[in-house]
């Protein structure tokens, strides 16, 4: 999704005030080379159930399934990407979708398959 304005101030304002139907598109991540060749699509919005690989940060190289997609904060939670709180409980570490790569798609939804076919054409 391309932002028309050049000023960083206005880009930040757009992301902060974006409606939920656009936030889903903003929460896109690139596909692995194998998936890219198979489906002919470069990136897709992340969904719960997708298997992703962390490409940046302290958890680089970790693979896991997406447990939650937080559209309000632009973050995702992945199995195996956790940290401990001071009381010892494990909580998911929030990741930005630009820092992960989709390794396996969750294709339980038939609409998603149609979206992929439409975008590949």
From Swiss-Prot:
Signal sequence extent? none
Specify the domain of life of the species encoding this protein.
Archaea
Query: Which SUPFAM superfamilies does the record match to this protein?
Result: Translation proteins SH3-like domain
Gene Ontology molecular function terms on file: RNA binding; rRNA binding; structural constituent of ribosome
| GO CC, one annotated term | cytosolic large ribosomal subunit
Q: What keyword terms does UniProt attach to this protein?
A: Ribonucleoprotein, Ribosomal protein, RNA-binding, rRNA-binding
Give the UniProt record's GO annotations in the biological process aspect: cytoplasmic translation; ribosomal large subunit biogenesis
Q: Which InterPro entries match?
A: KOW (IPR005824), Rib_uL2_dom2 (IPR014722), Ribosomal_uL24_CS (IPR005825), Ribosomal_uL24_euk/arc (IPR005756), Ribosomal_uL24_KOW (IPR041988), Translation_prot_SH3-like_sf (IPR008991)
Supply the SMART domains for this chain: KOW
The keyword Glycosyltransferase appears for this protein: no
Report the PANTHER family cross-referenced here: 60S RIBOSOMAL PROTEIN L26 FAMILY MEMBER
Q: Which NCBIfam families match?
A: rplX_A_E
Q: What does this protein do?
A: One of two assembly initiator proteins, it binds directly to the 5'-end of the 23S rRNA, where it nucleates assembly of the 50S subunit. Located at the polypeptide exit tunnel on the outside of the subunit.
Subunit notes for this chain?
Part of the 50S ribosomal subunit.
* HAMAP family assigned: Ribosomal_uL24_A (MF_01326_A)
The family note in this entry says: Belongs to the universal ribosomal protein uL24 family.
Name used for this protein in its record: Large ribosomal subunit protein uL24
Q: What is the lineage of its organism?
A: Archaea, Methanobacteriati, Methanobacteriota, Thermococci, Thermococcales
The gene for this chain is rpl24
């Amino acid at each position: 999704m391309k932002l028309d304005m050049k000023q960083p101030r206005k880009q930040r304002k757009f992301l902060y005030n974006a409606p939920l139907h656009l936030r889903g598109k903003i929460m896109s991540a690139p596909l692995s080379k194998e998936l890219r060749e198979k489906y002919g699509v470069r990136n897709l919005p992340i969904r719960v159930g997708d298997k992703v690989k962390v490409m940046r940060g302290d958890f680089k190289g970790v693979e896991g399934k997406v447990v939650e997609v937080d559209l309000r904060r632009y973050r995702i939670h992945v199995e195996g990407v956790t940290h401990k709180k001071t009381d010892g409980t494990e909580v998911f570490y929030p990741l930005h979708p630009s820092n992960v790569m989709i390794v396996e798609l969750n294709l339980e939804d038939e609409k998603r398959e149609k979206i992929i076919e439409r975008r590949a054409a």
